[in-house]
């Protein structure tokens, strides 16, 4: 289980654990933890028995550490006595063949589309090994399932989409930003298309002088080298606010009090942020690229061309001027919760693990 609280692969694992704890079934599972994250995860989930992998002595040597983690993973799993191993993220650490029945989650293969050269070859080798050494493969959307099969057409019988869940923290209302604001949450990079959002905002900021733009994400080279020059060119540095190291509780409140949430992403295997915003009854304008058309279920305002800043600006202005009714937002919330609640998705995943284990044991 990965420690990073904001990564989609981590959220997937934590929400599943939350469901297992809620159902009182923690005794049925053992957590296999990287030593880097074990103390914090044990603190969060004291209900589980745990096994740790890795070596403190190798923490300063990333390549050697990863190789050791991979072989230690296989060794500890084979010694565990478990009937099956469920890997919430199939990667270079969990890719080797093990004795128990193995179910790996492949969230998407977007990096196979967006990387080149040696890095692409490395991702291909890892993906090939995960697919080869997994008895079943779970993914998070029908889009991702189709993407996996486009690379691995011969594994159709062992790939299934079980969806993903959206979890918001308890209702502790606190307005964190005094002005009206448009919100974006996510990574800051080319494929998330933040540049177009900034350009679109620059077109309407003067007519929406009381409405700022809040970007929740980590500052990086892309922000410094691509976004900052656009802010300076359009003289909107004071109107665009970058929020880093945001807690889940604060993130919930950023969603809740936003006048509009905009998600212009070009690459998504699932796409939680627009769902998280909509479930808190915030108007959402979203791209429908990749999985987003599927997972948003046609319920949200859509961008025909997310790279067209003029279209985006026009639709942002229209929604801010004529926001949807409370009744409409409530209906959207209810519809999304039917499909993405932690209870429904958690049950689906746990039932699949249990039923697959039973079929495997009967087949032996």
Outline where the language-model segments fall.
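Carbohydrate transferase catalytic cores enriched for Leloir-type hexosyltransferases
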Residues: 1-364
